[in-house]
Amino acid sequence: MAGWSCLVTGGGGFLGQRIVHLLLEEKDLQEIRVLDKVFKPEVREEFSKLQSKIKLTMLEGDILDEQCLKGACQGASVVIHTASIIDVVNAVGRETVMKVNVKGTQLLLEACVQASVPVFIHTSSIEVAGPNSYREVIQNACEEDRLETAWSAPYPLSKKLAEKAVLEANGWALQNGGTLHTCALRPMYIYGEGSPFIFAHMNKALENNGVLTHNSKFSRVNPVYVGNVAWAHILALRALRDPRKALSVQGQFYYVADDTPPQSYDDLNYTLGKEWGFCLDSRRSLPPSLRYWLAFLLEIVSFLLSPIYNYQPPFNRHFVTLCNSVFTVSYKKAQRDLGYEPLFTWEEAKQKTKAWVGSLVKQHKEALKTKTH
């Protein structure tokens, strides 16, 4: 195949960075374009080092800026769209989440048509499928089950609408007479080095003598390692660029998991942190039913105060459901259509993530020393 180029939106983020690193190994790839609203100095430095291996262009811009998207897509062969706002407690605001996640995706699809980009891979979310109730038990869900979120909370709704737009865009005519081929990947909860959620959990625990919060002991999910999610994106772009494989992949969505054992979010945090002295809170936590109704009351208070004050509840019903559900999926369809097999075993993923957690502990101790001197 002739030389090709790939645009990764949200490429400076947790998942996006891993996708960029894997793209470096792709055959005949001439340029990687990385679009993000802002690049952290350490990310910019890391990407600068990679420019000796391949042409890597960093583009700072807004996903809602049509001119920015038009320029970013010009001459690209593939778009991997990871950029989104992940907000499960409504901290950002409904309008912003819906604009970035839905309108941003629609504008990017339109830019692909104008620039005649034939391949579009969308990073969706498990929350497009659920869970809808903490009482509902869903195990080894597959794509044929056609599970769908019933939540009107901005994050799951925005991801559902964005994925719908992407899959409906499959088959669109491009400006040059070609055809747009799309697919969507629905990863489970993603963990690994650099995870913003694990970072927040561990830092909060470090400020509380190493005691991890106990919010989700009733959950049972199959988390997925970031390196394996990135690998699934590479396999998806290979499939959509291959005329023989594209027929079975275009317009499809895929669950992405790996061989990480099903467990609660609390257990995952403890597994990754116990070596460094972290422990679970021994105090009894509220049962999910009581926590759910407390969340409902807080949402009512927030609504009643909204004309005069922007009260942000610490949690909501959607978050309580997410943290207390049994919800696991199968990745057999990705195996069949994409040839997906995890690049990293559970043991490898665990060790890499634990080492990173250890570095956070070290940084915390050094920061404390600096304060005391």
From Swiss-Prot:
SUPFAM superfamilies from the UniProt entry: NAD(P)-binding Rossmann-fold domains
Presence of keyword Repeat: no
Transmembrane annotation, as ranges: 292-309
GO biological process: C21-steroid hormone metabolic process; steroid biosynthetic process
Gene3D superfamilies: NAD(P)-binding Rossmann-like Domain
Catalytic reactions on record: a 3beta-hydroxy-Delta(5)-steroid + NAD(+) = a 3-oxo-Delta(5)-steroid + NADH + H(+); a 3-oxo-Delta(5)-steroid = a 3-oxo-Delta(4)-steroid
Primary location class: endoplasmic reticulum
Source organism superkingdom: Eukaryota
GO cellular component: a single term: endoplasmic reticulum membrane
Residues annotated as the enzyme's active site: 155 (proton acceptor)
Transmembrane helix recorded as keyword: yes
Annotated membrane topology: Single-pass membrane protein
Pathway: Lipid metabolism; steroid biosynthesis
Binding site for NAD(+): 159
The protein's Enzyme Commission number: 1.1.1.145, 5.3.3.1
InterPro entries listed in its UniProt record: 3Beta_OHSteriod_DH/Estase (IPR002225), Lipid_A_modif_metabolic_enz (IPR050177), NAD(P)-bd_dom_sf (IPR036291)
Alphabetical keyword list: Endoplasmic reticulum, Isomerase, Membrane, Mitochondrion, Multifunctional enzyme, NAD, Oxidoreductase, Steroidogenesis, Transmembrane, Transmembrane helix
Cellular localisation: Endoplasmic reticulum membrane; Mitochondrion membrane
Record function comment: 3-beta-HSD is a bifunctional enzyme, that catalyzes the oxidative conversion of Delta(5)-ene-3-beta-hydroxy steroid, and the oxidative conversion of ketosteroids. The 3-beta-HSD enzymatic system plays a crucial role in the biosynthesis of all classes of hormonal steroids.
Protein known as: 3 beta-hydroxysteroid dehydrogenase/Delta 5-->4-isomerase
